A protein has these predicted regions:
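Short, strongly hydrophobic alpha-helical membrane anchors
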Residues: 1-6
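Catalytic cores of carbohydrate-active enzymes across secretory and cytosolic contexts
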Residues: 10-591
Length: 592
């Protein structure tokens, strides 16, 4: 009875860890009862049992401490997860774009923080976690600011992590970044009806640059078990390259753009190679479950693999990869809000800058000049509004901030010309002395300037033709601590799954968008507040620290499972999905 009582306790412990752990217990129990209890065997079993108990206690202790911490998601939460659940782990972030750029200006060095959704999401995370951020050094003074190992400590004045710059030749940059990544993968993954262009020379450069970044990751790793956060479509081959050289690393790849359905994906000449590269990841994250499902379907169609849809796991080449949705977000509260004037002052400053009358309604759009963002479709909607409701002519101005982007590529040159031409047409058709309905500003703006624009706007238009998430929508909501303003949001942006109180529109339907514009223009302050308040609460509760914390907790569970498997001998078996996902009960922490 004593043995069975102890076994019952073990059942409960292992069941809490998942089915595969329970299977390990059953196997050990059967072996124990099938042979005589010799002294030597009992001693060895006690040692193994005690080792298993130690790992389980650590596993449970860490899980409980993390659960207790996850009430408010903040930098402190992330640091606690790292300290309690991933002690000693080195965090390495890899992205194409760097968080700080040094440029030469008038015999001096100017520091720039790029207005990038990826940077605005990841920079506060890296500040909180420390570690190393590896990125392409493209600033004209970047080489002047690094040490002999191509490193610079950032942020300036209060450094908390290392920026490791990787140098690319002009040919590498043109072919890897502008070529394969942005003429090939970018249009392939976005339903914007721009034809992808694939060249063998671009593919060769893409492979070479991914290898260069893999070399840098290995060089920067302080041990064999770093946590590597690979960012976006520039590095589809990198996870497999890291896995081959650092097999014990936890590689978390986050794909920031949509993943197409398998029929569209089949266009890519190197489709199998890209999937194989990504499946070197321990975890692959997407903004939405829809895109995660598309990825899984692509793997199912093009690779011989084992897929467990219930567990969201793919087994390929002796390794299991978990595929999940992690909706990205932004920092809350945004540090820069404390530095900004209130909404009324921002309105006055912006209207003074552009010579707008006090009673004119202001709609804004803020993004890179990109064919996926639906800028021309906003112009169509404005045209339709003025045709249907001419009384709004002279009473509404649309300000489009369109940061120059990839301007050497033909598709972007064409978009630039079309946008400026259409804006001028609208101004000629509906403008008058002292009034232009469209103001097009093709300049880079700092994050502070962008937030001032958000606070000054009556309406923010986010009308992407296709977007993984779109953080402009969340930034606008965050900026509006006055709980005023109306968000118009494309149904084809991932953010529309979360910001449900926005006016959700189809950017291809100009008539629908014009009616939504009219609704926004006539919306009362009370209704604006009723819509803005829950959206702000959603961003607050689901901020970028929760996004990162969810992935780090999942990484911790994977690492603990690996440690447990090694102790119990499960690690000696061929890798299988059961070894990995059975313990992976998605987010047992209270996330509400």
């Amino acid at each position: 009875m004593t043995n069975y009582g102890a076994d019952l306790l073990w059942v409960l412990i292992f069941a809490s860890l998942g089915f595969s752990a329970f299977a390990v217990f059953v196997s050990i129990s059967r072996q124990r009862r099938s042979r005589p209890p010799t002294v030597a065997h009992i001693a060895g079993e006690d040692v193994a049992a005690e080792a298993a108990r130690k790992v389980i206690r650590e596993f449970e202790k860490n899980g409980q401490s993390a659960d207790a911490a996850l009430v408010t998601w903040s930098p402190e939460t992330l640091r606690k997860i790292l300290a309690d659940d991933l002690p000693g782990a080195q965090v390495i972030v890899v992205s194409n774009r760097e968080p700080y750029i040094h440029n030469s200006k008038n015999d001096d060095v100017e520091l720039l923080v790029p207005a990038s959704g990826l940077v605005s999401a990841l920079e506060p995370i890296t500040r909180a976690c420390g570690g190393t951020w590896i990125a392409y050094g493209g600033g004209t003074a970047d080489r002047l600011m690094v040490d002999d190992n191509d490193r610079v400590q950032v942020p300036p004045g209060n450094p908390s992590y290392t920026l490791r710059r990787v140098w690319l030749t002009e040919e590498e940059y043109q072919s890897y970044y502008l070529g394969f990544a942005n003429e090939g993968l970018w249009p392939l993954c976005h339903i914007a009806f721009t034809r992808p262009i694939f060249r063998a020379s671009d593919w060769e450069a893409y492979q070479a640059v991914n290898r260069k970044f893999a070399d840098t990751v290995v060089a920067e790793a302080r041990n064999e078990r770093p946590i590597v956060l690979v960012q976006d479509y520039h590095f589809a081959l990198l996870p497999r390259m890291i896995r081959e050289r650092l097999p014990e690393a936890i590689v978390i790849t986050f794909w920031h753009i949509p993943w197409p359905n398998s029929e569209v994906y089949s266009i890519c000449p190197w489709r199998e190679r890209i999937l194989e590269g990504l499946l070197g990841s321990s975890i692959i994250g997407f903004h939405t479950q829809f895109h995660a499902n598309n990825f899984t379907e692509s793997v199912d169609r093009f690779l011989e693999s084992r897929i467990e849809r219930a567990d969201a796991a793919i087994s390929y080449g002796g390794q299991t990869t978990l595929v999940h949705a992690y909706p990205i977000s932004i920092e809350w509260p945004a540090d820069l809000l404390a530095k900004l004037p209130d909404a009324d002052d921002c309105r006055a400053r912006l209207r003074n800058r552009f010579g707008l009358k006090a009673d004119v309604k202001l709609a804004v759009g803020v993004e890179r000049l990109d064919y996926t963002k639906g800028i021309l479709d906003r112009f169509h909607a404005l045209d339709e509004l003025f045709k249907r409701y001419p009384e709004w002519i002279g009473k509404l101005v649309f300000l489009q901030i369109a940061a120059p982007s990839r301007g050497t590529l033909p598709a972007y040159k064409l978009l630039h010309d079309e946008c400026h031409r259409y804006a001028e047409e609208l101004n000629q058709r509906y403008g008058s002395e002292g009034y232009k309905p469209v103001i097009m500003v093709a300049e880079h703006h700092s994050q502070e300037q962008v937030y001032e624009i958000y606070r000054a706007a009556d309406i923010c238009m986010v009308t992407s033709l296709h977007d993984g998430m779109n953080l402009v929508a969340k930034e606008f909501v965050t900026a509006r601590d006055d709980e005023q303003g109306v968000l118009m949001l494309s149904t084809f942006a991932g953010a529309s799954r979360e910001l449900l109180e926005a006016l959700i529109v189809n950017p291809y339907d100009a008539a629908m968008m014009s009616e939504a514009l009219l609704q926004a223009l006539n919306m009362t302050p009370d209704e604006q507040r009723e819509r803005m308040r829950p959206m702000r609460q959603m961003v607050r509760d689901n901020n970028v620290y929760r996004w990162a914390g969810s992935m780090l907790l999942d990484a911790a569970r994977l690492r603990k499972r690996g440690d447990l498997d090694r102790v119990t001998g499960a690690g000696d078996r061929p890798p299988s999905i059961d070894n990995v996902v059975s313990m992976f009960e998605r987010k047992r922490v209270a996330l509400s």
